[in-house]
Amino acid sequence: MYPPELDSKILSIIKKAVTIRTTHTYEYQYSLLFGDAGYLWLLLHLFSISKNQYYLQLANVTAKKLIENYDTLEEIDFALGKSGVLLSLIKYYQFTNDNTLKIFIHNSIGEIYHYFLQRDTAKESILDYSFAHGYCGIAYALFAYSKVLEPSMFYNDLHTFHTELKKLLEKVTSNTENLGNLQLSWCKGISGIILYLCMYDCDGNKDIISKYQEFVFNHHLKMMTGYCHGITSLLQTTVYNQNKLLMEKIQQVILACSERDDHGLLMFQGDSGKADLFDFGIGSMGYIGVY
């Protein structure tokens, strides 16, 4: 449970958001990163902590909207497309056990799976295998489906994919000259692959995860401090494998690159080198979100 004062503030913000969301439309408005799928995830999180039925009621409305508009989505990926939406609906199913929803998810996962099978393993592109826009995010949606709805489903495919990831990481990290901010990032690079390995099998990938956490950290001067393109996403991976020593090092780097605004608030570096406060992907909100 949240403290009463904080709970009241959160509820007030959500009620304002309801008004805004019913009067405005946005690009990628159904997506996990920018739209209703992410909003649904938040509502379920708030309900699980507060047990306030209001959040679940909003979640019901949001899930219905996602289902009704699912076929309008053009992207397949985790951040903007169908994989992210299905992941949120899978989470929603855990709260409802609704059979109609289960059938919808079951009928929809095939398209994601087919796209996943069509990947060109010969390309070995870090971008193609990335979390936000590549195969890692799609694989995680398949993993969540098999974990919640059909145990052992996709097991062999995900095991093969896991082997591909290990080979890709070895190849990509053997040549550091071409590694820049995005190649090290969560959305398009190595940090996102590390996060997938953490969520897929943290214990089984313990040595690999630690190895590439150190690799990314050793190149942190090429990165900013935000979540999407910066080192904060690497900080999240240290929570999974309890790498406390590296966690402290990353925190020190983030704090060293920060500054105070006119109100004394701690600001973190965005991609532009400036301090961005209210942005999850490139600003301070991503750092807060990790905690």
For the regions a language model picked out, list residue spans one by one.
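Glycan-recognition and catalytic cores of secretory/periplasmic carbohydrate-active enzymes
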Residues: M1-Y291
